[in-house]
């Protein structure tokens, strides 16, 4: 990294006007005394949240030269070697000698690309009054380096694509209580959400541009977060694995069947490689593998996982939207609704399957989802699952179309839009 070139990068960032921003539900503390770390899938809004932090700091009277904002994916910073991060401080001091001694605010994007970043950030926190905000797109990399270099010094936040309430806010929609017409607008908005997904830029883009944007997103994750970061040697297998996972939200995942399918098509791959690639996809926040709800860690590890994706719209990169079942999209959305809040989630396998169990060490709620309850077989199947003996007192059936069904005692039916909007809770 060259210091003179770095000055141009810093100055360019200072001169660019802040873009218009839609606020997210998460409000970051500006003066926590901790390093704030935002982790999540690419294009989920982490960078815009950093820019919103900058906007708030400027509104509080902080001078623009006190804010150092850099993306470590900027090719002008390459090659970046360990020990060169101090050049950032030197370059900023030379650009703004009048601000030396004032608090500095550091906003670093995709920080995992900077060798030795955790030691540098620790020193910033120890020696520079102000605050440090970081983003990254690898859960394992950040958690490992935070654990070794910044234990007890960080507040970490997972950033997901838009929730349904955030989607409504982005579109300028608001529910009016006790209004049947407003209820209908909310239900239609949910249909749109389950089609469009929650990637912020995609939601705001023209419909004709969305497929191309989604394909670019998946390509970016494929190359940068998977192939290049982990130096994977079998891109064909990785591409097929991504295609398979993104097209199968809310499905039981059978690695052995996929292994046989890939082998039958002439793609040589070992099972260990397949599991390793899956782990990398989880680290990149592309997928989530939901375990069976068992107290035994061994049973959880041995049983099949249920696959969920960070945003079902990414599956449209490989096939048209209608090919992905809308009921599975709804189930995936309900999973994400809870995953944003906690990690101890599971499912119950078997003929009377429970889609989502909240609380693995002691079930707090059973939640099933269905698109429509008008079909008698669907209605009876969901009831049998939720009314099985044992389990928690909270049992909820979330449906897009309730068809006027009345739940028996001990079970609640909640319209999907109300549930995902937070108007009714489990």
What residue spans do the PLM features occupy?
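Interdomain motor-coupling "hinge/lid" segment immediately C-terminal to the ATP-binding subdomain
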Residues: 2-5, 10-15, 139, 144-252
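Hydrophobic positions on the alpha1 helix immediately C-terminal to the Walker A/P-loop
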Residues: 49
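Accessory nucleic acid-recognition modules appended to NTPase machines
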Residues: 66, 207-364, 371
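Pre-Walker A adenine-sensing motif
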Residues: 13-33
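Short glycine-rich substrate-engagement loop in P-loop NTPases that contacts/grips substrate
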Residues: 70-101
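Structural recognition of the conserved hydrophobic beta-strand(s) that form the central parallel beta-sheet
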Residues: 107, 131-137, 158
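Conserved lysine of the Walker
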Residues: 46
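Hydrophobic anchor at the beta1->P-loop junction of P-loop NTPases
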Residues: 38
């Amino acid at each position: 990294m060259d210091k003179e070139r770095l000055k141009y990068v810093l100055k360019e960032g200072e001169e660019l006007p802040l873009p218009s921003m839609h606020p997210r539900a998460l409000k970051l503390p500006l003066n926590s005394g901790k390093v704030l770390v935002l982790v999540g899938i690419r294009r989920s809004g982490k960078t815009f949240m950093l820019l919103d932090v900058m906007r708030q700091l400027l509104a509080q009277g902080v001078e623009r030269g006190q804010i150092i904002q850099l993306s470590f994916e900027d090719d002008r910073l390459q090659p970046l070697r360990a020990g060169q991060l101090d050049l950032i401080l030197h370059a900023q001091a030379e650009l703004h000698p009048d601000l030396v001694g004032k608090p500095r605010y550091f906003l670093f994007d995709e920080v995992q690309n900077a060798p030795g970043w955790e030691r540098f950030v620790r020193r910033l926190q120890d020696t520079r009054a102000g605050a440090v905000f970081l983003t990254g797109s690898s859960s394992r990399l950040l958690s490992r380096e935070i654990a070794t270099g910044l234990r007890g010094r960080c507040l970490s936040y997972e950033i997901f694509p838009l929730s349904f309430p955030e989607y409504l806010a982005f579109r300028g929609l608001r529910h009016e209580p006790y209004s049947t017409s407003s209820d209908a607008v909310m239900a239609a908005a949910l249909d749109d959400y389950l089609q469009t997904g929650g990637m912020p830029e995609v939601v705001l883009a023209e419909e004709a541009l969305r497929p191309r944007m989604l394909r670019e997103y998946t390509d970016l994750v494929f190359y940068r977060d998977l192939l290049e970061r982990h130096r994977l040697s079998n891109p064909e297998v990785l591409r097929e694995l991504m295609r398979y996972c993104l097209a199968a939200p809310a499905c039981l995942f059978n690695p052995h069947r996929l292994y046989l399918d890939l082998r039958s098509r002439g793609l040589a791959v070992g099972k260990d490689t397949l599991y390793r690639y899956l782990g990398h996809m989880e680290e990149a926040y592309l997928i989530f593998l939901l375990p069976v709800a068992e107290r035994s860690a061994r049973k959880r590890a041995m049983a099949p996982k249920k696959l969920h994706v960070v945003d079902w719209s990414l599956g449209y990169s490989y096939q048209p939207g209608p090919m992905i079942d809308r009921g599975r999209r709804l189930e995936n959305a309900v999973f994400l609704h809870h995953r944003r809040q906690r990690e101890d989630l599971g499912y119950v396998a078997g003929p009377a399957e429970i889609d989502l169990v909240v609380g693995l060490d002691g079930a707090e709620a059973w939640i099933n989802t269905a698109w429509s309850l008008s079909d008698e077989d669907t209605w009876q199947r969901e009831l049998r699952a939720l009314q099985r003996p044992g389990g928690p007192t909270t049992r909820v059936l979330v449906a897009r179309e309730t068809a006027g069904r009345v739940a028996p005692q001990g079970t609640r039916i909640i319209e999907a839009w109300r549930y995902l909007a937070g108007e009714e809770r489990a």
